[in-house]
Swiss-Prot record:
This is NADH-quinone oxidoreductase subunit K. Belongs to the complex I subunit 4L family. The keyword Transport applies. The gene is nuoK. It is found in: Cell membrane. NDH-1 shuttles electrons from NADH, via FMN and iron-sulfur (Fe-S) centers, to quinones in the respiratory chain. The immediate electron acceptor for the enzyme in this species is believed to be a menaquinone. Couples the redox reaction to proton translocation (for every two electrons transferred, four hydrogen ions are translocated across the cytoplasmic membrane), and thus conserves the redox energy in a proton gradient.
Length: 99
């Protein structure tokens, strides 16, 4: 398979994720779209690494996945806390930061 096809797929996944972040108001859906964007960037990194024969981009993709896993833990904890206090996962309700 041509490496350009992987790059096209990466652009498509990133576009879907960006449109989800911009159009949706649910925090969980927005969070999943951000993760989709990170995976699209990882796919592009791995594709470029494969095209040029270097392992540097694959290491960057691996560390990005590690950071994304940590982000999932912290992000879901914040979303669950907001959901418990506000009874809604809407981003519009999260701008009220009073305790």
């Amino acid at each position: 398979m041509n490496p350009a096809n992987y790059l096209y797929l990466s652009v498509l996944l990133f576009t879907i994720g960006a449109s989800g972040v911009l159009l949706r108001r649910n925090a969980i859906v927005m969070f999943m779209c951000v993760e989709l964007m990170l995976n699209a960037v990882n796919l592009a990194f791995v594709t470029f690494a494969r095209m040029h024969g270097h392992l540097d981009a694959q290491m960057i993709a691996f560390f990005t996945m590690v950071v994304a896993a940590c982000e999932v833990v912290v992000g879901l904890a914040i979303i669950m806390t907001i959901f418990r206090t506000r009874k809604s996962a809407s981003v519009d309700d999260a701008n009220l930061l009073k305790g």
